[in-house]
Every structure is written in structure tokens, then in C-alpha cells.
Amino acid sequence: MIEMEILRNTVQKIAKHAIEAIDKVDEAELEMMISKIMDASSVFIVGTGRSELIGKAFAMRLMHLGFKVHVVGDVTTPAIRDEDCLIAISGSGETKTVTLAAETSRSVGATVVAVTATPESTLTGYSDVVICIPSKTKEPWKYYTSGVLRGEYDDLTPMGTLFEDSTHLFLDGLIAEFMSILGKREKDLKERHAIIE
């Protein structure tokens, strides 16, 4: 019989890490992120793997709030323009598809917001705003090894788990900020919820 000790301990570690990581987010950068999203004609979101899934969840909630939002790679996604904003999610800041999207967006004059665990990376070099959520990522392993020796990381939260879960909670918290700014309530979001699924 499973005693759920591993599950409970892991969830507690993830939750504790997320709270501590989000507390370290630079408030000035956060205010700029909010401003850039509010001012954008359209918001584009890019990520790969689990970061993409978290980005899609954020895109859905932005849509529920009335923002014009697109996920990079979807067949209906239009060209990004200078009045738009790209939210680029990558723990390492080196994911090729994400850095290429950031570079391309920057080249046409769009605003780029990086959500990353790595403040100095290829991605942040293309970014106007950097939201750093300090966490272990799937790379580089040299930081992971030293972190394990200091007792900071655990094999039960593999690769990018801490970054991805912390980012998901951060972005859901950001949705609550937008709800407050826009004076929206849950019933307002429900009006835009899908009715054909």
C-alpha cells in the first residue's frame, strides 16, 4: 500500500520552492511585463515541451480576459508585428526554437518578455523585460550537481520541474493581477470559455 509520503513531501518541496522563487521576481520587471502585455496589440507566447504547455495555459486565461493572444507554432498564428508582445518561456534561456522566436520578434520591433531561470542567456539578450524565476533547469548540469551537493535540489523533481511548476503558479498569479487591474470577475472569464470542445 502506498503511504503517499513521497508524493506529499515532493508537493511540499515544489510549493515551498515556488513561493521562494516568485518572491525573488524583480517588481520593476514585473510591472514592465504587465504594462507591455496591456499595451500590446496581440500577445504571442512561445515555449517548448512542458514550458509550451504552461504557456498555452497562460494564453487561455489571457484569452478569457479578452486579450488577443496566439501560441507560436499554431497553424492560425499570424505574423508578429512591432505593436505586439512575445512572452518567451525557457528555463535555460537557450532553447533554440524559443531564442529564434525572440530574435525574430525583436528584429521586427516587437517587445520580448523572457520568463526564465537563467538571467544571463541567449534569450535574455533578445529581451526587453526579464522575469527571472530562479530554479533548477534541465541544463546546465554543472549548476545542478553543485546544487545537489548543497542540498538544494532533489532527483524527485527532475530536470525542469521546479522551474515549470513555479512558472505556472507565477503566471496564474499574474492572471489574478490582470483580473484586479481590469475589474474582471470569474463570471466575466466564463463568458469567453469554450462551448464547443
From Swiss-Prot:
PROSITE patterns: SIS. GO terms for biological process: carbohydrate derivative metabolic process. Residues 33-184 form the SIS domain. SUPFAM superfamilies: SIS domain. GO terms for molecular function: carbohydrate derivative binding; isomerase activity. It comes from the Archaea. It holds the Pfam family SIS. NCBIfam families: RuMP_HxlB. Belongs to the SIS family. PHI subfamily. This is Uncharacterized protein MTH_249.
